[in-house]
């Protein structure tokens, strides 16, 4: 994903937001708070499992998947949250996937999308999300803060995604409680787990850190476990022949 490609996505999002109706705020779906769970379960590397049919880098991943069944398998095997892609154009997701999954599971759900506007936040909440994603690279620091504050005022938690030290510092200034480190370089679209390892020395007490992208094996998870509270895994689970077994391999006990 080059910056040009990220710009294309954001341009598409701006167009979608322009057409989007402002929904009335519905009651927040009740489940546990992700940050609280991470705080109280630091003896294991927690898995956030993603429902993702396709991506710009890989193309089609699993178009025929029964999304609800996949999500229920995630929940049954102890994942801490389910991430649901809702971007239609680039990831072949849909808001209805979030709605369907959120109505059939009890654990938190994350709306995985490129959020640039309050209307998207309301829409995510109404569809059952209890956590939203805000990407530092996609927003000015001022806009990021406005959207972060708006989401938290609505009772949502926010996963603030970073890719480098400058963005991590933005997340810290924001006061973000849950911070993601994406191992995908947005300029080259290459992935490298070393991104997460390199940023770990700058982590701060009292925050919870999630490593995202390029995590496929138990060995990958072992490498990240000393530094992170959790990992977000999509492709490896969407392609796994035995999803339950793959989740178990990724849930590293820290003792």
UniProtKB/Swiss-Prot annotation:
Q: Which UniProt keywords apply?
A: Amino-acid biosynthesis, Aromatic amino acid biosynthesis, Decarboxylase, Lyase, Tryptophan biosynthesis
Q: Which family does it belong to?
A: Belongs to the TrpC family.
Catalytic activity annotation: 1-(2-carboxyphenylamino)-1-deoxy-D-ribulose 5-phosphate + H(+) = (1S,2R)-1-C-(indol-3-yl)glycerol 3-phosphate + CO2 + H2O
NCBIfam families for the chain: PRK00278.1-3, PRK00278.2-4
Write down the EC number.
4.1.1.48
Question: InterPro entries of this UniProt entry?
Answer: Aldolase_TIM (IPR013785), Indole-3-glycerol_P_synth (IPR045186), Indole-3-glycerol_P_synth_dom (IPR013798), Indole-3-GlycerolPSynthase_CS (IPR001468), RibuloseP-bd_barrel (IPR011060)
Which pathway features in its UniProt record? Amino-acid biosynthesis; L-tryptophan biosynthesis; L-tryptophan from chorismate: step 4/5
- Gene Ontology terms describing biological process: L-tryptophan biosynthetic process
List the protein's name: Indole-3-glycerol phosphate synthase
Q: Which PANTHER family match?
A: INDOLE-3-GLYCEROL-PHOSPHATE SYNTHASE, TRYPTOPHAN BIOSYNTHESIS PROTEIN
Q: Name one Pfam family in it.
A: IGPS
Fetch the Gene3D superfamilies from UniProt: Aldolase class I
Lyase is among the record's keywords: yes
> What domain of life is recorded for the organism?
Bacteria
HAMAP family from the entry? IGPS_B
The molecular function terms in GO held by this entry are:
indole-3-glycerol-phosphate synthase activity; phosphoribosylanthranilate isomerase activity
